[in-house]
Amino acid sequence: TDGAGNISWTTASSGALEEITEGSNTGYRIVGRDTANYGDIGVNAVDLSYSLVASTTNGATGRSSTAMGYETKASDNFDTAMGIGTAASGRSSTAMGNNTEATGFTSTAMGENTDATGDVSTAMGTNTDAIGEASTAMGAGTDASGLVSTAMGAGTDASGDFSTAMGSFTVASGEASTAMGESTFATGNFSITMGRYSAAYGDNSAAMGYFTEASGDVSTAMGDSTVASGDVSTAMGEVTEASGDVSTAMGSYTEAPSLAETAIGSFNTPYTPVGVSSWNSGDRLFVIGNGQSSNSKSDAMIVYKDGSTIINGALTLSNGSDSITLPNTDGTSGQVLGTDGAGNISWTTASSGAL
């Protein structure tokens, strides 16, 4: 039209769209494009892409699809492909950026070299893969292969169904597991790990901190280099180990190897229990370690499962206003305990004729 109501035939200018019919489908493509470099236009498709090489797949070939950029492909119904070398082949999928591919139904791939293959999946960033249905992979080199899984950060892997891996090189392979931080592993079902180089191997286990390990089911390891290997065990502090079932090790370099044993303090003495997962009256129930190093291990107090107790050191009993201190050494034959009236009790030789 000349703007005055006069309409006449004219040559379309470069860059304008023209209606074309190919293979019984009618859509729209930029004027002047070499048809040998494109697949047949899709019904109501809009092809704004540019292709220099012969192809039967480039462009907007799906129904109501849109292709933009260089060597892009929108091949299924309602697809959108934008950028360089992107391909949207899943129905209602979107591929944007550089060499991205969206093959899953209503999937989205954005960034560089990303792949969204699962239905309703999303891959964003660089070299990410969203393989599982409804999965999400974001960042650099992340993989989300589990159902409804999420991988975020750098080099993370969420392979368990409903799992989440976040941070740097974390792995969440257990069902509904969560791995966060750097190089952490959550392999147990419903497990969680946080921090650096920590691992939660047991089902329903939790490992937090630095180099911690929770390998027992329903176990918890926290702190620095702690290990909770017994079922329902807890290890906290520094280099503590709870290997008995339902055991607890807290403090520094403490060990709780028997069932329901609790060890606190530092560097308690080691022993071999009879029952790791069963009750034995000769095993320890509670121990307070007061050792100073791995070469100087000792115990301030030991309570055994039969109730017998060993106290290494003086024992002071107090009612708040008065107190007495019992000696921690044995007397000689014939000696008795005596008091000086000030709360100090010691071994003394009984006077002649005393009862």
Task: Outline where the language-model segments fall.
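Extracellular repetitive beta-rich solenoid segments
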Residues: 1-14, 279-309, 313-353
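Periodic small-residue-enriched repeat registers in elongated scaffold domains
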Residues: 15-312
